[in-house]
Amino acid sequence: GISQAALRSSNGAVVSLGDIKNGDTCGGSSEWGASSSYGWAVDDTGSKAVGTAYVDRNRDGVCESPYLGEIVPFIWDAKRGMRELDTSNLPVADLPWIRAHAISGNGDVVLGTSNFQYAYAWVKEGKAINLTERYGAEPAYAVSFDGHRVALNLIDTNTYQGKGVALWDYARGLTPIGSLEWCKDVPYVSWFAGDLCESMTGDEIKAQVGSPPMEIFDMSDDGSILVGRSGSFFTGFVGALWIERIGWMTWDDFFRKQGVVEASNIPFSNPISISGTGTEVVGGMVGASFSWLVNMNQVFVCE
C-alpha cells in the first residue's frame, strides 16, 4: 500500500492529510514502502501542516521524477485540504525536489528548501521567496510565532565564507546579530595544520575564512532566544545560545555562568528545540543517542 501524512492528536485521534491529485496511486519510495506525502511541521494550534507531496505530472505512473516538479511542498488545513505551495517563480526544471519543513506558530510563514541548496519562504501562501539569492542564506528552520523573525545563517555565495546570523522580517528586512567567535568559542582545526588558534587570533582566522558556520534549529515564540550549534564534523561542534540584548555564548559558558559546573564539562553540543516560552530546551551531544532537558525558569547571566 501507499502511506500518506497524518496528524495524531493527544487523545489518540488520527487525521489523514491525503495527497495532491494522485489518489494515493503513487509516491516517494523508501525501504518502508511508498508515501504520497510526508508531514514536516504543524502550527501551534495543529490546524495547519506542511511537508512534501508527490504529483504525477506526466502521468507515467511515477510520482518522484526529479526536475519535473513532481516532488513539491504542501500546506494543509481541514477546510481546504492539501494543496501545493506556490513555486511558479522558481526554476523547477533545475530543481530535483522542493519541500516545506517549518511553519510559524500562527501559520502565516512557511520555510523550506530544495536539495539543501536554497532557503525558501512563503508568506501567507504567496510566491516563494528565495532567501539564498536575496541574502546568501542557508536553509532555515527557526521562525517566531508571528513569522516576523526567521533565523538565517548567511554565507558569501561567491567565496562561501560565513557572514554570521541575521533575523529576517518579511516586512522590514534583515537584522544581523553576529555569531560565535573563532578561538574564543569555536576551535579552528585545520586538516593539515592542526589547531590554528595556537598560532592565529580569531580575527585573523575570520579574515581568511569568515565567521564560524552556524546552524539555528529553533527559537522561542517571541524570537528573543535562539538555540543551535556551530562547528563541523572536522572541528567538532559546540552548542550555541543567543539571547536578545545579551548576545551569543556557548552552552558550556552558559552552564558555567549559572553555576552548573558539572554540566559545563559535558558537551551540550546539539540543542535542537526550545519551548515557546523559552524556559525549556531539549538536546544532547552530536552523534550520541540520548537527550537532556534543560530547565531555564531561573536564569542569571552576568560577567
Q: What residue spans do the PLM features occupy?
A:
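Conserved "turn/edge" positions that cap or connect secondary-structure elements
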Residues: 1-303
